[in-house]
């Protein structure tokens, strides 16, 4: 499975442009499991007798906002796993239950953040605030009195406070520096179409990791762009350097409509990647798995 993230989403909070609830792919948070026990937080008992557990209503909200301000002072000492823990709970407070689709297959870091948020399920905002505050207190037992002085001085970005947010700002790509893969990622159908029709770009051109435009379009969920590429004879079964086809990407990202589009266009669901995984084995969607099996089953 790909563990790189060559693309990143532009939203400063969590990615995907104007969508404030999709994790982006800024500076990596680190590897390992997404479970809290593996975030270096086992010593943080969020149900213990922390002062925040006794707070309610406005008092708890004020303590939470204060803790969010204090995070800026902890960036150099907290691990990326701990920042991820805080990120998930901040999102739970500000947005609620994870309500976005899984990030793109290339977007490894975004998937980690998305998974951390999603695993909180129906956790209440109150519990998320308490756990957030408890974690910050554990990281900074003495507390930071400076936070109250500067609260309101900076606009909060919605990514766990200004400090956490600053780690994930996407570097803006100047127009003159963009390549065809950037336009594909942006779903700039007009530009991609002109580049292909004018022969400026081969529809099957690959990036440094062997990913074709079709891989990128499927990864980002751009159905219309996928259709355009197929109409221009994109190699539907092209494999990247890890042996993954566009069908692997669409399946892993759980874009059911694109999976169906690819299958109807002749994509081969029996192709395995270098790890021996079929497209149906890289998705968590039972509906997509079922669809893939229908096309894999011998006809007779």
UniProtKB/Swiss-Prot annotation:
It is found in: Cytoplasm; Nucleus. Residues 1-43, 142-162, 270-300 are annotated as: Disordered. SMART domains: ANK (SM00248). It comes from Danio rerio (Zebrafish). Its main location: cytoplasm. Keywords: ANK repeat, Cytoplasm, Lipid-binding, Nucleus, Repeat. InterPro entries: Acyl-CoA-binding_protein (IPR000582), Acyl-CoA-binding_sf (IPR035984), Ankyrin_rpt (IPR002110), Ankyrin_rpt-contain_sf (IPR036770), FERM/acyl-CoA-bd_prot_sf (IPR014352). Higly expressed in the central nervous system, developing eyes, otic vesicle, and trunk muscles. It comes from the Eukaryota. ANK repeats lie at residues 209-238, 242-271. An acyl-CoA binds at residues 87-91, 113, 132. Residues 284-293 have a biased composition (Polar residues). PROSITE patterns: ACB_2, ANK_REP_REGION, ANK_REPEAT. One of its GO terms (cellular component) is cytoplasm. The gene is acbd6. Disruption phenotype: Knockout animals, generated by CRISP-Cas technology, show an exaggerated response after lights are turned off, a reduced locomotor activity in dark period, light-induced seizure-like behavior, and excessive axonal arborizations and progressive degeneration of muscle fibers. Brain size is significantly reduced compared to controls, and musculature is disrupted. Proteomics analysis shows increased protein N-myristoylation in crispant animals. Residues 60-145 form the ACB domain. Residues 1-19 have a biased composition (Low complexity). This is Acyl-CoA-binding domain-containing protein 6. Binds long-chain acyl-coenzyme A molecules with a strong preference for unsaturated C18:1-CoA. Does not bind fatty acids. Plays a role in protein N-myristoylation. Residues 147-157 have a biased composition (Basic and acidic residues). One of its GO terms (molecular function) is lipid binding.
């Amino acid at each position: 499975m790909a563990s790189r993230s060559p693309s990143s989403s532009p939203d400063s909070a969590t990615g995907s442009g104007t969508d404030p609830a999709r994790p982006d792919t800024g500076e990596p948070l680190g590897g390992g499991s997404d479970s809290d026990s593996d975030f270096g937080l086992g010593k943080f008992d969020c149900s213990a007798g922390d002062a925040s557990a006794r707070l309610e209503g406005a008092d708890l909200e004020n303590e939470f906002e204060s803790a969010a301000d204090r995070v800026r002072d902890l960036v150099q000492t907290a691990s990326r796993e701990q920042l991820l823990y805080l990120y998930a709970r901040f999102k739970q407070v500000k947005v609620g239950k994870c309500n976005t689709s899984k990030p793109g297959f290339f977007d490894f870091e975004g998937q980690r953040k998305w998974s951390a948020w999603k695993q909180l399920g129906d956790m209440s905002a109150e519990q998320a605030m308490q756990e957030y505050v408890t974690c910050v207190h554990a990281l900074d037992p003495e507390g930071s009195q400076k936070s109250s002085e500067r609260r309101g001085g900076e606009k909060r970005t919605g990514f766990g406070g200004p400090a956490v947010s600053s780690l994930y700002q996407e570097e803006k790509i100047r127009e003159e520096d963009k390549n065809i893969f950037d336009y594909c990622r942006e779903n700039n159908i007009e530009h991609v179409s002109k580049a292909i029709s004018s022969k400026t770009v081969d529809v099957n051109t690959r990036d440094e990791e062997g990913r074709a435009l079709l891989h990128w379009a499927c990864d980002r969920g751009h159905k219309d762009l996928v259709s355009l590429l197929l109409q221009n004879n994109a190699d539907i079964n092209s494999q990247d350097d890890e042996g993954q086809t566009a069908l692997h990407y669409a399946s892993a990202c759980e874009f059911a409509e694109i999976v169906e589009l690819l299958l109807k266009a002749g994509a081969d669901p029996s192709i395995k990647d270098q790890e021996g995984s079929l497209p149906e084995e890289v998705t968590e969607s039972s509906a997509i798995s079922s669809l893939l099996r229908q096309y894999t089953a011998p006809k007779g």
